[in-house]
Every structure is written in structure tokens, then in C-alpha cells.
């Protein structure tokens, strides 16, 4: 072995492999499913750790340079004196080297493929290690990098080993020629940018480094080199077959044994020699064989019933000794498209899916097992059954967990060229076919044995080109057991088995040039269109969003070929950063000084970065629930329908509860024994009491799982519904005797007094300016009309990110003058009545000399010390629909709790309230604020009948919010952690509130039904303060 490295570092850098799309690797081993090379059958069967694997994670030596040419030659032989330590796996940007960049479409480098900037941040990693002396004596020792972003060179003991790019698939090299007894030294030079970066333009943080596991694997000299497992099913799924195509690295007289296990018990086995059937006139393969093992009455795998077997593949010597064993979890299932429907095991699927980026707030793109399990448990608990690996192959452990817990997976190639113009510039260029091909073929070769993967995806947002057509054909030939999907190319793309648009709407066409997005209802009815439609992205959950999600699910359940979709997306991609005082906060694009950046567009999650749910997650849970209910109010019969396709209920109980104005009056439960796709009815006539008290009567039902499962705790609620029960009784409100309030007025004020209470209107503005109780003022600001909200991301659209969008709601409101309204009182008069005081006020709201709104109020102060407010608002025809119509003020009181009768307990809005349950709720004041990372309107509770907050008691039919943060602060503040509690409590009382929208976040997406587009609105409220003892 030469003591001098060859080629030299200078020679390697002169080749500029990282700017050559035809060069994706040097000396990298072929892709294959994950290997463990057990030497013991029982260990393989039981999935024990393998003694043939050595993990190299931990602290490595690290030196950072602004370009690869700055790396000194001596680093190949020994660490630099100023080297630091850096954890592997990690992203070096999160260790204060370089800056993470968040951008959606725009490339973070000048667009000139395949060239990348000369200033190309470079991380030089090294570490010492030793290996078992037996590994040096025999066999092959490999090093496996599960993920390195974006390209790297590898040396061992000063000798160049190889080069690789594609940041999301393993790079595996043979280290055997370079290893030595005692200490060995690895050196890895990682480049931030390479030509492959043009294929990795996903909507995510752009970070670098060795961010997945690094390990050594020792294989025997003669070893298994590839294993392909399929599970064909026959006779209406009553018979199955385990088929294993096994490859060996070199022709030999060895034999291979295939065994199938279930719960540790042997189901069947077969042993045979290598050698295939005759392929053509030149003969057969000597280095492979196919074993077929029949299985009677196999237990089928699905996301509902993720039954797994364990297959062991043992390489035997000619004498019958075990050379090595590989093992895989096996699920018997069949995926097909027939009659225009995607089916699993013969049943049409309804995809309850989400897109998921690999993201951790502290660790960036480093995934650990605990985070992966947490994500899966949350998905299962909230009725998700599918996940799209957006937009790259995930950590290999992810698929094993999805196999075991039960999630359908779309495995997606690491290809996105969204920032190219046109988008298909690279995908239609044969020069880029080798690079694209390796990203697809190596994904399939690594992941094909996982039952959870039901669809392959050719990538994301790369237009449509001839390269896609070639890759589609390759996948269909190599794996005919799964469909292929790809969104690019518009309505007529042939490179997909599934219509998988993003952000197509339920009823609204979006006729974009070349790539129209028809409404999903229309799409499945186009001439000669017979494919299923599954939205690859929909319901953009950016901040306070997700409005109209229920409309999609109404359509999915109504039209069989609308088979669901994948919500965008799972987790807010914010990173933890510390402010100047060392306090941590969640940072988004631009917070690291990164350019270009797309600010908060990375905050689209159903969960916060720490996996705390957004309110939208509950909306998804309710819409996607596997049990549907109907209630016949005439016969008082409840019917429950199971949407499980394969699972019989064996751990479900149906609970019912009758509530009068939120107070329980009767309850009961039934055992729920339902076959898949069946229903059962439960008569409640004999169980419901006769009630004569006034109030709203609600029937609540829920399905709970009494016993804990692999993914939920005991008594997990998995479905619910409720109905307002009709009542024929009418009740007159009781008469209340008491002294009438007294009126006094002068040129400046109108004052009303009742006992220990006093109210005051000021004539100059016509507002209720103060409310005293026992001479203590209760208001910090007057009670005023409110027609605006702190803009949501959906209100802003693409304004303030790339350009001003005149169609965005916030721009339309600005142009109309809604943020600079001048309020003018045109009427304020008061009258003493026999039983109270009446005040009538009228206000005009003007901008640029035009009257935009007119608000007329009638205030009745009664003998109970309460004030009833009747509000009428007229809206000018020229005004765009306002965000809200209501009243607001700043209360002096700060109370730790609020109680209300209405929809809750979590935040809800008029177009996102499917998951909000009518009842009597109590929550801490701080829980009424939803801490969206980018502040805006939040915390609303709709359809409220009564609100108790400290001494305040408010009745009517209204929406409310209570917050320590005022509207102006919410409008002006850029981050949640910068919000400062204000004096008192801000109270908003809305008679009407516009929806939040959510079909997407860059165009107006609030459905017409939830816009305040009328010309006149009326609402009523009753406010009272409790007498203090």
C-alpha cells in the first residue's frame, strides 16, 4: 500500500466533480436495501443489534473553510491545530458555522447550472477509529453515510476512497484496502453546493453537513449483495407467497435459505442454490436466485392492521454453515389501481395524509428515533393514515416505524427544480438524466422491501420532461407492484398513475396557462380521464389557517375517485435561536441574516416545532375520523358507521351524553362491535329524560378506546359528533323587579347610574367611555366598533415576500382605507324610560372623504344593572368584505380564567370549526391566545352564548377573544417571543367574523360562504358585571 495519497487533493479539486452532472459518484457501492450482516439467525429474526455494525456517530474534528481550494493539503494526513469538535450527525450551520438559508422557490445561489459559486462553504471532518482485528483478516468492511449535504470526498488513512452526492440517500464505500491495525483516520470534505443542489430546490431550510448516521458494516468475502421481497396474493387474498430474489456478490457454490416467521414461530422455509432461470440465448444468472414460499391464509398488512412477519435470508456455505443473515419485516398486501380506484387488498383507500419534512427545532434536519415515533403517534392519534416523504427519501428508520405502526407512505425522489425557468429546464435535458435517474433508482433499490410504501413519487415541482417519462417507465418495469405518481406536467401528464395535483380546489377552476388546475370534482369527470385523484398537497396550514378543510372531506366521501390527499404540512420549520439575552425563540427565514429568504413561509405546520398541536390539527382529526354518525331526531336513534376497511372494532366503546346549556343531564354507553365498513343503530328513546328547563339541549356522542394501543393511551377519543336536539317548549324570561337606572347628561357626557354602577358616554366620540363599579373604573379604552384584524398569513398572501399582490386581502383593505378609518359620531341621544335608560348612537367610518361603514347602536340599561346592545352596520358597496364586524375594548381586569358556553375548547373560526364542540368550557387566560410564531389574529371562539370573565358576564350569540396583546401590537410584531403583555385584557366581541381560508396561502382562499359580503349586519349583546360581595 502506497504511503502517498493518490490522486492528490489538488488533482481532485481540479476535476470539479461537484460541477459535473454526469459525475454523481466515484467508487460508491451499488444501492441495496439496508444490511445488518448478522452472523446469528436468532439475532436476525429478533432484530437484535448486529455485531457486524459499528456506529461512528459522536464528536468529530471539524474545520471550516469558505471554499474547497482553501483546505490545506496537510489536513488529509492530520487534524489542523485550530480544529474544533462537531457532533455527527448535525448541520454545521446550527453550530454557528455559516448561516442556514430558508427559501421556497428561489435558489440560494445564482442560477447557472451546473456551475456553483466559487465561494462554496466547505466542512472538513475527521475522526480516529479502530476495527476488530478479525475484520482486517477477512471480508469486506464498508462505511455507510446515510445522509450528507450536498457532496463529499472521502479519505481513509490519507488515501482517497471516493466521492458522492445526493444528500438524502446513503453513500457506501469499501474501506477494506485502506484499513490498518490500530488507529485509522477518516477524513471527509463536505461541500455546501454542488450541481446536485439544482435538483434539491425544496421548500425548506438549506443546511449542510453529515446529518444522518455514519457506520461501518463488515460483510464476509462472499456475501449477499441484494434482496428483493414481494408478497403476491391469490384466490381473493386467501393465499399468499413470499418471493425473495437474492443476489450474491460473486458466483459460488453457496446456498440460500429463506425462512418466514411470525411472532417468533416458523411459518415456512425453503433452501436452494444460486442460479436463475434461463434469461436469453446467453443463459442464466449465476449470482442470483428467486425463492418462492407459499403462505396459506396470510394475515394481511394495512395501516389499520399492520401485521408483520419476519423474513430471514441466510447465506449458507457449501457445507451448510451460516455465512451471514439478512432480515426484513414483511407485510402481505396488494396495491393496485382498478376501475379508477387505488386499492389495497381489494379495498379502495381513502388517504388521510400529511406531508412531512424531516425537521427538528434544535437539530435541524437530524432525525432521532424519539422524534420519529412522536410524529407517528401524533399522526395516528389524529386519524392520519398516510404520509408523503416530502420531498426526498427519509431516514431509513422512518420506514420501519411506518411498517410497524401502520402508515401508508409515498416515497419521493430527491428531485425538485422549482426555481428553474421554465421549471422543466433540467428535467427535459438528457444531460441531467443520469443524475435524476440515480435519485429515483437508488431510492427504489433501498426502500422496495417496505410494505408501508404504496406509491413511488418521481419528485416534486420539476415541471415535466423526457427524463420523467424515462424514469416512470423504469420504475414501472422494475417494480410493477406499486403505482407511480408525479404532480408535474399539468392535467394531462402521462408520467403518473394517479392525478395528484397540489392545491386544486373543491369547486373552483384555476385555469393557469399550460398547467390548469381544475376543481377536483371536475377533474375526475374530464373526457378519457379514469385515474384516481389524490391531492399531493392541499389545505395549506400556514399559521392561523386551514379554513374550508371540511369541504374537501365532504367531496372525498361523496365521490369515490376523490381518494383523499396529503395536507401541507406536518411541522412548522422554525429553528431555535437565542436573543441577545440568551432567551430561546423560534426563528424563520431572514433571522440568521440569510439571503435570499422567504420569511415565515416555512411555518406551515399542523404542529409547532416542538410538536405541540396547532388548532388545525384537531380539525384534521375530526374530518378524518373513521366513524361517522347520524341521529334521527324523530325516533331518537343514533347510527354509527365504521369507515375502517379492514379492522373490526375490538377496543371501542360508544359514549353518549345529553347536555342542557353545557350541563350534563343524562349519559350512557354501549359496546361497539362493528365489522369493517358496517354500521349499527342504538335507540335512545327510553334513555333520554324529559326536561322542562329552558336552554339548548345537545346530544354528544364519542367513540373511545378503553385500552391503550401501540399508538394511544387508554380512553383515547377517536371520533365524536353532536346535535342540537329540537324542543317544542318555549320559555318566557322571568320578570326581574328592581329600580330603574337614572340618566343625567350635560354638554360633555351622558351618565347612567344604577346602584353601585355608573356608565359614561362622551359626546365628542359617542362611545361608552367608562363603566364604574363601586367607583372603580372597569375600562382602559372605550368600547368601539372593530372591523379589522391583525392580518393572517392567508390575508397577506405573497405580499411583503416577493411583491405587493393587489388581490391579497390585506392590500385590498389597505387600498380601501380600512386601516386608516376616521370615526365620526353623527348621533348620540339618551332617554329616561320607566324601566331603564335608552341611548342611541350612530357612527360613520370614512376614508378619503368616502363613507365606508355606518354603525347604529341602541343601548338599553335595565333594572338588573345590565346593558343590552343592538348593533346595525351598513357597508358601502365599494368596500371589500371586512375582516370582522364587532366591538372591542381594553378591560382593566386581568382574571386567570375564562368560562364560556359555546364552541371550544380550542380556537375556532367560522370556516374552521368542525372540531369545535358546543359546550361549557373553562380555560386559563393564556390558553386563549394561540402562540403562532408569526403573530396575527388568533384565539377566536365562535357561536358563544355566554362568557364569564372575572366580574364580566356577557350573553348573546357572538364570537369572542380575550388577550393580553392588542390588535396593533399583533399587527406590528414579527415574532411571538417579542409580544409584550399590555395593561388589562383586550376583549373582542364579534357579531360576525370572516373565515381564515386555507386552500392555499398565496391567493384569496376564503370560500364565498364565509366572506362578509353583505350590505347590512345586525347583532345583539348583553353585558353585565357581577356585584362584588
Curated annotation (Swiss-Prot):
SUPFAM superfamilies: (Trans)glycosidases, beta-Galactosidase/glucuronidase domain, Galactose mutarotase-like, Galactose-binding domain-like
HAMAP family found in the cross-reference section: Beta_gal
Coiled coil: none
Cofactor: Mg(2+); Na(+)
Single GO cellular component term: beta-galactosidase complex
Family according to the record: Belongs to the glycosyl hydrolase 2 family.
Classification of source organism: Bacteria, Pseudomonadati, Pseudomonadota, Gammaproteobacteria, Enterobacterales
Tagged with keyword Cell inner membrane: no
UniProt-annotated binding residues for Na(+): 203, 601, 604
Active-site residues, Swiss-Prot/TrEMBL: 461, 537
Name of the gene encoding the protein in the UniProt record: lacZ
Site (Transition state stabilizer): 357, 391
Reactions accelerated catalytically: Hydrolysis of terminal non-reducing beta-D-galactose residues in beta-D-galactosides
Chain sites annotated for binding Mg(2+) 2: 597
Keyword NADP among record annotations: no
Annotated keywords: Glycosidase, Hydrolase, Magnesium, Metal-binding, Sodium
Catalytic EC class: hydrolase
Protein name: Beta-galactosidase
Molecular functions per Gene Ontology: beta-galactosidase activity; carbohydrate binding; magnesium ion binding
EC number, UniProt record: 3.2.1.23
Residues reported in the UniProt entry to bind Mg(2+) 1: 416, 418, 461
NCBIfam families assigned: PRK09525.1 (NF007074)
One GO-annotated biological process of the protein: lactose catabolic process
Pfam families with a match to the protein in the record: Bgal_small_N, Glyco_hydro_2, Glyco_hydro_2_C, Glyco_hydro_2_N, LacZ_4
Cofactor note text: Binds 2 magnesium ions per monomer. Binds 1 sodium ion per monomer.
Amino acid at each position: 500500500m502506497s504511503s502517498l495519497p493518490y490522486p492528490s487533493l489538488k488533482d481532485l479539486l481540479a476535476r470539479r466533480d461537484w460541477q459535473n452532472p454526469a459525475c454523481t459518484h466515484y467508487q460508491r457501492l451499488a444501492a441495496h436495501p439496508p444490511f445488518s450482516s448478522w452472523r446469528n439467525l436468532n439475532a436476525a429474526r429478533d432484530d437484535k443489534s448486529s455485531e457486524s455494525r459499528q456506529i461512528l456517530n459522536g464528536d468529530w474534528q471539524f474545520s471550516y473553510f469558505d471554499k474547497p481550494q482553501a483546505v490545506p493539503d496537510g489536513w488529509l494526513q492530520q487534524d489542523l491545530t485550530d480544529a474544533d469538535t462537531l457532533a455527527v450527525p448535525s448541520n454545521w450551520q446550527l453550530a454557528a458555522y455559516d448561516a442556514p438559508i430558508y427559501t421556497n422557490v428561489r435558489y440560494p445561489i445564482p442560477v447557472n447550472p451546473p456551475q456553483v459559486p466559487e465561494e462554496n462553504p466547505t466542512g472538513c471532518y475527521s475522526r480516529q477509529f479502530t476495527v476488530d482485528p478479525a475484520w482486517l483478516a477477512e471480508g469486506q468492511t464498508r462505511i455507510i453515510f446515510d445522509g450528507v449535504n450536498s457532496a463529499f470526498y472521502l479519505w481513509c488513512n490519507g488515501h482517497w476512497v471516493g466521492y458522492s452526492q445526493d444528500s438524502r440517500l446513503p453513500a457506501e464505500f469499501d474501506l477494506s484496502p485502506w484499513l490498518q491495525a490500530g488507529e485509522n483516520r477518516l477524513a471527509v470534505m463536505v461541500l455546501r453546493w454542488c450541481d446536485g443542489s439544482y435538483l434539491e430546490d425544496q421548500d425548506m431550510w438549506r443546511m449542510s453537513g453529515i446529518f444522518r448516521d455514519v457506520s461501518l458494516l463488515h460483510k464476509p468475502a462472499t456475501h449477499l449483495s441484494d434482496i428483493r421481497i414481494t408478497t403476491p396474493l391469490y384466490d381473493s387474498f386467501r393465499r399468499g407467497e413470499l418471493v425473495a430474489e437474492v443476489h450474491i456478490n460473486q458466483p459460488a457454490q453457496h446456498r440460500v435459505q429463506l425462512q418466514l416467521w411470525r411472532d417468533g414461530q416458523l411459518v415456512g422455509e425453503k433452501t436452494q442454490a444460486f442460479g436463475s432461470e434461463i434469461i436469453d440465448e446467453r443463459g442464466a444468472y449465476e449470482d442470483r436466485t428467486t425463492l418462492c414460499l407459499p403462505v396459506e391464509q396470510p394475515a394481511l398488512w394495512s395501516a389499520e392492521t399492520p401485521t408483520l412477519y419476519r423474513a430471514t435470508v441466510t447465506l449458507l456455505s457449501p457445507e451448510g454453515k451460516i455465512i451471514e443473515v439478512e432480515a426484513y419485516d414483511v407485510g402481505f398486501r396488494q396495491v393496485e389501481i382498478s376501475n379508477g380506484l387505488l386499492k389495497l387488498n381489494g379495498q379502495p383507500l381513502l388517504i388521510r395524509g400529511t406531508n412531512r419534512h424531516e425537521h427538528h427545532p434544535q437539530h435541524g434536519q437530524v432525525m432521532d428515533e424519539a422524534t420519529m415515533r412522536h410524529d407517528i403517534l401524533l399522526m395516528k392519534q389524529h386519524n392520519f393514515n398516510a404520509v408523503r416523504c416530502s420531498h426526498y427519501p427519509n431516514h431509513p428508520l422512518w420506514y420501519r416505524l411506518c411498517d410497524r405502526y401502520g402508515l401508508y407512505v409515498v416515497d419521493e425522489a430527491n428531485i425538485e427544480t422549482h426555481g428553474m425557468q421554465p421549471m422543466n429546464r433540467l428535467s427535459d435535458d438528457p444531460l441531467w438524466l443520469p443524475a435524476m435517474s440515480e435519485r429515483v433508482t437508488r431510492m427504489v433499490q433501498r426502500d422496495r422491501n417496505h410494505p408501508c410504501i404504496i406509491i413511488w413519487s418521481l419528485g416534486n415541482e420539476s415541471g415535466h420532461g423526457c427524463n420523467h417519462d424515462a424514469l416512470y417507465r423504469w420504475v414501472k418495469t422494475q417494480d410493477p407492484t406499486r403505482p407511480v405518481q408525479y404532480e408535474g406536467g399539468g392535467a394531462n401528464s402521462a408520467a403518473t398513475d394517479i392525478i395528484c395535483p397540489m392545491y386544486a380546489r373543491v369547486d373552483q377552476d384555476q385555469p393557469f396557462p399550460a398547467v390548469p388546475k381544475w376543481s377536483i370534482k371536475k377533474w375526475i369527470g374530464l373526457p378519457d380521464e379514469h385515474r384516481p385523484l389524490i391531492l399531493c398537497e392541499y389545505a395549506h396550514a400556514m399559521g392561523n389557517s386551514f379554513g374550508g378543510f371540511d369541504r374537501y372531506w365532504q367531496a372525498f366521501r361523496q365521490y369515490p375517485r376523490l381518494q383523499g390527499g396529503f395536507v401541507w404540512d406536518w411541522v412548522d420549520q422554525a429553528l431555535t435561536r437565542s436573543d441577545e439575552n440568551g432567551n430561546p425563540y423560534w426563528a424563520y427565514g431572514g433571522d440568521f441574516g440569510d439571503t435570499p429568504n422567504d420569511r415565515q413561509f416555512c411555518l406551515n405546520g399542523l404542529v409547532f416545532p416542538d410538536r405541540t398541536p396547532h388548532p388545525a390539527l384537531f380539525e384534521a382529526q375530526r374530518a378524518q375520523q373513521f366513524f361517522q354518525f347520524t341521529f334521527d331526531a324523530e325516533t331518537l336513534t343514533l347510527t354509527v358507521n365504521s369507515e375502517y376497511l379492514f379492522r373490526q372494532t375490538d377496543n371501542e366503546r360508544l359514549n353518549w351524553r345529553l347536555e342542557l346549556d353545557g350541563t350534563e343531564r343524562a349519559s350512557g354507553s354501549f359496546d361497539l362491535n362493528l365489522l369493517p365498513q358496517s354500521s349499527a343503530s342504538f335507540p335512545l328513546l327510553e334513555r333520554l329524560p324529559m326536561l322542562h328547563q329552558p336552554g339548548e339541549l345537545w346530544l354528544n356522542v364519542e367513540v373511545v378506546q378503553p385500552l391503550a394501543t401501540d399508538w394511544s393511551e387508554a380512553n383515547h377519543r377517536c371520533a365524536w359528533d353532536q346535535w342540537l336536539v329540537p324542543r317544542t317548549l318555549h320559555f318566557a324570561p322571568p320578570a326581574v323587579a328592581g329600580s330603574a337606572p337614572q340618566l343625567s347628561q350635560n354638554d360633555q357626557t351622558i351618565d347612567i347610574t344604577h346602584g353601585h354602577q355608573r356608565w359614561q358616554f362622551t359626546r365628542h366620540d359617542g362611545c361608552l367611555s367608562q363603566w364604574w363599579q363601586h367607583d372603580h373604573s372597569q375600562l382602559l379604552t372605550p368600547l368601539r366598533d372593530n372591523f379589522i384584524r391583525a392580518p393572517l398569513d392567508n390575508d397577506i398572501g405573497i405580499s411583503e415576500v416577493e411583491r405587493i399582490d393587489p388581490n391579497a386581502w390585506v392590500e385590498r383593505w389597505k387600498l380601501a382605507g380600512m386601516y386608516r378609518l376616521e370615526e365620526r359620531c353623527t348621533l348620540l341621544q339618551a332617554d329616561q324610560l320607566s324601566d331603564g335608560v335608552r341611548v342611541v348612537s350612530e357612527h360613520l367610518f370614512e376614508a378619503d372623504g368616502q363613507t365606508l361603514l355606518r354603525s347604529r347602536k341602541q343601548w338599553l340599561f335595565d333594572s338588573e344593572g345590565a346593558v343590552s346592545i343592538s348593533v346595525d352596520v351598513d357597508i358601502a358597496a365599494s368596500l371589500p368584505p371586512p375582516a370582522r364586524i364587532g366591538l372591542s375594548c381594553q378591560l382593566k381586569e386581568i382574571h386567570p380564567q375564562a368560562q364560556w358556553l359555546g364552541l371550544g375548547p380550542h380556537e375556532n373560526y367560522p370556516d374552521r370549526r368542525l372540531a369545535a364542540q358546543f359546550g361549557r368550557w373553562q380555560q386559563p387566560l393564556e390558553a386563549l391566545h394561540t402562540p403562532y410564531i408569526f403573530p396575527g389574529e388568533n384565539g377566536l371562539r365562535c357561536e358563544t352564548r355566554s362568557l364569564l370573565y372575572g366580574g364580566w358576564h356577557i350573553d348573546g350569540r357572538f364570537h369572542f377573544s380575550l388577550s393580553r396583546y392588542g390588535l396593533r401590537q399583533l399587527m406590528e410584531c414579527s415574532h411571538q417571543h417579542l409580544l409584550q403583555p399590555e395593561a388589562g385584557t383586550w376583549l373582542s366581541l364579534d357579531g360576525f367574523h370572516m373565515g381564515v381560508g386555507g386552500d392555499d396561502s398565496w391567493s384569496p382562499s376564503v370560500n364565498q360562504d364565509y366572506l362578509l359580503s353583505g350590505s347590512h349586519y345586525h347583532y345583539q349583546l348583553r353585558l353585565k358585571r357581577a356585584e362584588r360581595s
